[in-house]
Design a protein with these regions (language model features):
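Short beta-strand element of the alpha/beta-hydrolase
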Residues: 60-70
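Bacterial Sec-dependent N-terminal signal peptides
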Residues: 1-21
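Typically the conserved alpha-helix immediately C-terminal to a functionally engaged Cys/Sec
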Residues: 80-82
Length: 153
């Protein structure tokens, strides 16, 4: 019995060391936060995927991908059901994708008052918020670039 316990302990120690060195075991992270919008007069939630090297090299210019959720969804849907962190860690480790920042804003409003979505409509100026407040905020907070430098046209 003692031999089995020692053998299991050695195996677990060995496997944990392997897992720490596995190429897909990145230390990327997902951050969820809010930004107060003057345009919408409310806090708007967003989720950001930050690559492994972000903490070590915050001055690096990362490309930014904005993923928008669908109707009845919110900002964490891409991390919870889309598994953005796991997918990106594996794609970067395999060389199929470059390191990037992925941002998922919450465009959901009050669905009972027809305030919902990514476009400007009476009582809901989300598009104005997105271009005049959100993009510049993300650019300064996470990429150290001007908003137009973080996206393609």
């Amino acid at each position: 019995m003692k031999r089995i316990i020692v053998w299991l302990a050695v195996m677990m120690y060995t496997l944990s060391g392997y897992a720490q060195n596995a190429p897909w075991n990145f230390q990327s992270k997902v951050v969820t936060d809010t930004l107060f919008s003057k345009v919408l007069n409310s806090k708007r939630a967003y989720t950001v995927f930050l690559p492994k090297s972000f903490e070590q090299n915050k001055e690096k210019k990362y490309p930014v991908l904005y993923l928008l959720h669908g109707m009845w969804e919110t900002n964490p849907v891409w991390t919870e059901r889309g598994h953005v962190k796991d997918v990106m860690d594996r794609l970067v480790a395999s060389g199929e994708a470059c390191e990037m920042i992925i941002v998922t804003p919450n465009a959901g409003g009050n669905i009972h008052l027809e305030w919902n979505g990514y476009f400007d409509m009476p009582g809901w100026k989300y598009e104005t918020f997105f271009y005049t407040e959100f993009l510049p905020y993300i650019a300064v907070s996470y990429t150290h670039l001007r908003a137009h430098e973080t996206r393609s046209n």
